[in-house]
């Protein structure tokens, strides 16, 4: 069974919708965009309560998504938020649509960071995930960097060099 709450029709705000979802014991909670501190805070609470929370953030890559969540909170709470994230965050997927060289439809670029038990405890509360997924061990776990995807698309002549430079995260 699917129960959907539409903001403006079924709920006044994301916050009100999330509070109602928590009271109704939903298994999965989908948030189209986490735009304020209250929504982010409730999403973390829902994840801590065992709900699968899927949320969208307007960021350029997976690491930026994590940073945006942490930076929503005041400085004095950021250490605690990093700790909470390290306990509940299963992974982050960031997507971008890149223009194809042939002028056809766009193609997808992804940045994937998956947590595992070794990554989940931040060192002194500073990092939830490693900054890069170029490390071969991380790639074996299913992590994918946007730069690697962009490079592969360029090498396969799907995108041109200007597009590759534009979408590369760490430069060329």
What are these regions (language model features)?
Residues 1-172:
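Short, flexible helix-loop junctions that flank or precede catalytic/ligand sites
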């Amino acid at each position: 069974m699917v129960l959907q709450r539409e903001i403006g029709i079924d709920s006044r705000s994301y916050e009100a919708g999330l509070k109602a979802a928590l009271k109704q014991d939903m298994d999965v909670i989908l948030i189209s965009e986490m735009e304020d501190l209250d929504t982010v805070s409730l999403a973390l609470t829902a994840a801590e309560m065992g709900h699968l929370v899927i949320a969208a953030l307007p960021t350029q890559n997976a690491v930026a998504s994590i940073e945006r969540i942490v930076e929503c909170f005041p400085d004095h709470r950021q250490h605690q938020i990093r700790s909470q994230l390290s306990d509940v965050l299963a992974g982050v997927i960031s997507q971008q649509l890149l223009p194809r060289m042939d002028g056809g439809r766009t193609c997808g670029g992804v940045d994937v960071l998956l947590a595992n038990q070794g990554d989940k405890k931040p060192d002194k509360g500073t990092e939830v995930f490693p900054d890069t997924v170029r490390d071969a061990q991380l790639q074996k776990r299913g992590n994918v960097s946007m730069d690697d995807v962009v490079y592969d698309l360029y090498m396969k002549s799907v995108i041109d060099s200007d597009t590759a430079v534009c979408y590369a995260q760490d430069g060329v």
